[in-house]
């Protein structure tokens, strides 16, 4: 009987010790997750009275983010309006945050493009630019001159063209279409396309067309000539340097200068007529043997040394005497070794 009672006492003591050991293990270990980062969740925090205040994040870094204090939020909501102090859900509060209500009106921007900086061009400015561009030419001093600056002489002639009349007649219609554009992009620079269609013909016209109208037709007969006197004896000769080409000699395999074997020389009498005369003007030079030679110089009618025939006279024929080409492309001058 005594042994049986002792055995029951030992079993009961063992059960009590086992229950206490289970409670110790439950207090030392967290149910899930890393113990160092989140630790054990206190069972007291699951109480319904403290649930809203002491509830911690189940995962992540508790010390970094954690739970916001509801008391502080309540105080903020009471002291400050919600629409002003409401923060962005993510990002940096100081950089992004909520803008004040008056910022939208104070810092109001244009919808698109640099509307405030560049603005819209008026139709009159565009027409003036096109007129200046298409009525520009250069005078004898390479200075730009615009026809619209001289309306009494040239303005009527240029502005009577079909292109300008078409624009001036439709000015009111184009201006109405110009004002209907939506405020987007660089609309001040580009403008409405209907205006570009109307001005396309004027934009494609060359500047030289107005030079022909002002200064008459350009004389292109003697464009490649030089203002030098010529020797008539050289024009009576023809090129005979290619007579031995078929013989295969080394000296006749290539033309010496220009097309002198194919075209030869021009006849001076055929160019200037039979009325031209040789006068007593003497042009002297010395050859390789230092023998003086004098040749009469073929004189031509004096003309204005400008290019335009009608307005400024006809240009002198440029026959070269000192260079390698005596004529246009003719025979090589025998006098080139002296000069």
UniProtKB/Swiss-Prot annotation:
> What tissues express this gene product?
Strong expression was detected in the queen and forager heads, while weak and almost no significant expression was detected in the nurse and drone heads, respectively.
Q: Name one GO cellular component term.
A: synapse
Modified residues annotated as Tyrosine amide in this record: 154
Q: Where in the cell is it found?
A: Secreted
Q: Which residues form the propeptide?
A: 19-27, 41-54, 219-252, 267-301, 333-339
Q: Which UniProt keywords apply?
A: Amidation, Behavior, Cleavage on pair of basic residues, Neuropeptide, Neurotransmitter, Secreted, Signal
Q: Which residues carry this modification: Glutamine amide?
A: 38
What start and end residues bound the annotated signal peptide? 1-18
From what superkingdom does this record's organism come?
Eukaryota
Q: Which residues carry this modification: Arginine amide?
A: 65, 96, 118, 190, 263, 312, 329
One GO biological process term is: chemical synaptic transmission
Q: Which family does it belong to?
A: Belongs to the tachykinin family.
- Entry function: Tachykinins are active peptides which excite neurons, evoke behavioral responses, are potent vasodilators and secretagogues, and contract (directly or indirectly) many smooth muscles. Associated with sex-specific or age/division of labor-selective behavior and/or physiology of honeybees.
What this protein is called in its record is Tachykinins
- Originating species: Apis mellifera (Honeybee)
